[in-house]
Design a protein with these regions (language model features):
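Conserved mixed alpha/beta catalytic, RNA-binding, or beta-rich assembly cores of soluble enzyme
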Residues: 71-134
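TRNA-recognition modules of translation machinery and tRNA-sensing kinases, especially anticodon-binding
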Residues: 176
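Active-site helix-to-loop segments that bind/position phosphate- or nucleotide-bearing substrates
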Residues: 1-99
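Single conserved hydrophobic/aromatic residue that forms the stacking wall/gate
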Residues: 179-187
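Short, structured protein-protein interaction patches enriched in aromatics and acidic/basic residues
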Residues: 130-152
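Acidic, Ser/Thr-rich low-complexity intrinsically disordered segments
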Residues: 149-166, 170
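General structural feature for long, well-ordered alpha-helical segments within catalytic domains
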Residues: 30, 34-37, 114, 118, ...
Length: 187
């Protein structure tokens, strides 16, 4: 189980387009309130599945082929902070758009921090192996439509409530689906 105790405020400010600026008192208070709301509301969940080579069923596009070239095992992973976050942001969009934007930035930080914690879990599990960077459907020439297949393989709709619609966007929106790393032998 993953828990989030604090969120990276500098990263949230960067998502807001304010990297390197000083916040005024009102914005500082709003940031504090929104961080607390996200931490209280977030329900971090994740799944991963190991896939052994060959990866023919997921190799649509040249970029993913290059990414997994030489790999013996790859890890398909998804993470979410839950649907209540989407509701919280939508409600704020009606009454206080500034708050909604700050909530959205902290929610993005939260799902990224969940992914980083999963990366740490996998790095420990695959100690002594070379781990590549994350690669998601929609990167380069890798079709975003692959998200539906990923969700099916992971059984994510049933296990953690992560789905996609016809547009292939993830629901809840503050979620991530990717080949997080491979476990090729250390070189």
């Amino acid at each position: 189980m993953i828990t989030l105790d604090r969120l990276n405020r500098k990263e949230a400010i960067r998502y807001l387009g304010g990297a390197g600026i000083s916040l005024n008192y009102r914005m500082d208070v709003l940031m504090d309130e929104c961080e607390k709301e996200i931490l209280k509301t977030a329900e971090p969940r994740f799944l991963y599945v190991e896939r052994k080579a060959p990866f023919d069923d997921i190799l649509l596009g040249n970029d993913i082929k290059k990414h997994l070239e030489g790999c013996h095992t790859a890890v398909m992973m998804c993470a979410t902070i839950g649907s209540e976050i989407d509701k919280l942001i939508r409600i704020s969009q009606i009454s206080d758009m500034a708050r909604a934007v700050v909530l959205d930035s902290f929610a993005s930080v939260a799902v990224e921090q969940v992914c980083q914690k999963v990366d740490e879990i996998l790095a420990e599990k695959y100690s002594g192996k070379y781990m590549t960077f994350r690669f998601s459907p929609g990167y380069g020439d890798y079709p975003i439509e692959m998200q539906k297949e990923y969700l099916r393989i992971l059984d994510a709709p049933r296990k953690i409530g992560l789905t996609t619609g016809d547009s292939c966007l993830l629901v809840p929106s503050k979620s991530c689906l990717l080949y997080t790393s491979d476990a090729a032998d250390e070189e």
